[in-house]
């Protein structure tokens, strides 16, 4: 969307390896990075995804929220998450100019990996918390099967209702614990 730009940071491309290779760098900063950085000197900051996450590291949701809000130290800060509206804010150009551009999912983020007959397989392995899971589950109205694993100790919840999938398969080290908390 932005000519001569690159995606770097927590997305998997180290910032320091790519610095000054493009005119614009779109940097995904994790809460860990926001906590460690001394001073934020970003032209634009977008605050997204404040949901109970990494509480085991930050100690509390309040501390996690405080760290995530550091993005507001950018010259311009917004909570807008629609990529087309963001493009309009950043470039100061009308968002209608990009309405027909097809945006693709990032790897492992509700990524469509295979379509066979009437089955579509999506990889959402980056969805490591309930908020991300809820987002993914709301992306389709078609019948689907959910394959789920995770660490219930990373996020505190008593019970989690999943509506939508025709079947739910739970696997992994914590399968028994998760199956006791998830109902379908």
Residue ranges and their predicted role:
Residues 21-81:
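Flexible active-site lid/hinge loop adjacent to a nucleotide/diphosphate
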Residues 10, 28, 48, 64, ...:
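Residue-level signal for inorganic ion chemistry
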Residues 86, 90-165:
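Nucleotide phosphate-binding/pyrophosphate-handling subdomain across enzymes
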Residues 152-184:
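C-terminal helical cap/extension that packs against the catalytic core
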Residues 1-8:
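Walker A (P-loop) phosphate-binding motif
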Residues 38-41, 71-76, 139-141, 159-166, ...:
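Short, conserved loop/helix-junction motifs that constitute active-site signature segments
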Residues 10-13, 29-33, 78-83, 172-177:
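Short, polar loop motifs at secondary-structure junctions
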